[in-house]
Amino acid sequence: LNQSDPHLIKENHAMHTPHLNRRHWLAAAGAASLMPSAWAQNYPDRPVKIIVGFAPAGPSDIMGRWLAQRLSERTGKSFVVENMAGAGGNIGMGAAAKAQPNGHTLLLASSTYVVNPSLYKSVPYDPLKDFAPISMVGESPHVFFVHPSVKVQSLRQLTDLVRSQPGKFSYVSAGSGTVAHLSVEQLKISLGLDMTHIPFKGAGPAVQSVVSGEIAIGCTTLPAVKELVRGGLLRALAVTSAQRFASSPQIPTVVEAGFADQESSTWQSLMAPAGTPAAVISFLQREVVAILGAPGAREQLVELGFN
């Protein structure tokens, strides 16, 4: 028999293919439409990893752990932070971009997410295509600070000191391309200061280098230095906001110091790899909104140093 004979093909198809009427197609379409929501009801079915592209004790790490704890409490499932530091956050962002888009790997991104493509020759992610945004979760101003042995009490005194001794001083940041790094570079250019940048893999180790006295000057976000300033291990000279920060009112602003053009902040945002099911994105959005709107959440974040 010639199995390719069109008459045989038509006859076999009629014998073995069930008749599907309009009701069958509507039922099938309805079942398919329920699949994403049913799948989301079981999400997450294993621990969820939140990648932070910087070392522990920096703002992204602090926010990531705060958020992970509350997501775990609300869902009864495990959300954990994994620090993947280096290259101004590029290592972590690249790893998150390549992760399976199933909702079990997320990214706690910061301002470097949009800055780095303009600073580096190449980055391991496409900021427009590789991620699906879930929610903005926080924002924090920066702080200019020094080791207590540096005999200055204000940002103006610090810039005068650096100008008087060109090339002598270095300053630290959480990494090249961070907003704090760019803020200091802007200050250097506007005042003609000669000062060397020492980048670290995160605010935590950068701050510790100043606490130890290894480096004299630093600039990073408020959450990374807040308690160290309160404890007298660092001296804060100015916060880069228009008004004094509610939980650190003793720190003057850059506006008060005469540097109004130095206002800046770093944001944190939760993201998922592109292609993550829409039902999972919606679920996470609802959970994050509920967490941020919960009684006492705003006060907790302000105390940590976030807006």
Residue ranges and their predicted role:
Residues 39-128, 168, 176, 193-216:
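N-terminal (or domain-start) structured segment
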Residues 55-57, 111-112, 139, 147-152, ...:
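Short coil/turn segments
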Residues 113-122, 188-190, 217-251:
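A ligand-binding cleft/hinge motif common to bilobed small-molecule-binding domains
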Residues 1-14:
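Short, Lys/Arg-enriched N-terminal segments with co-localized hydrophobic residues
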Residues 98-103, 118-205, 254, 267-300:
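Hinge/capping helix and adjacent helix->loop/strand transition within the periplasmic-binding protein
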Residues 15-32:
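N-terminal secretory signal peptides and thylakoid transit peptides that target proteins
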Residues 35-37:
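N-terminal signal peptide c-region/cleavage motif recognized by signal peptidases
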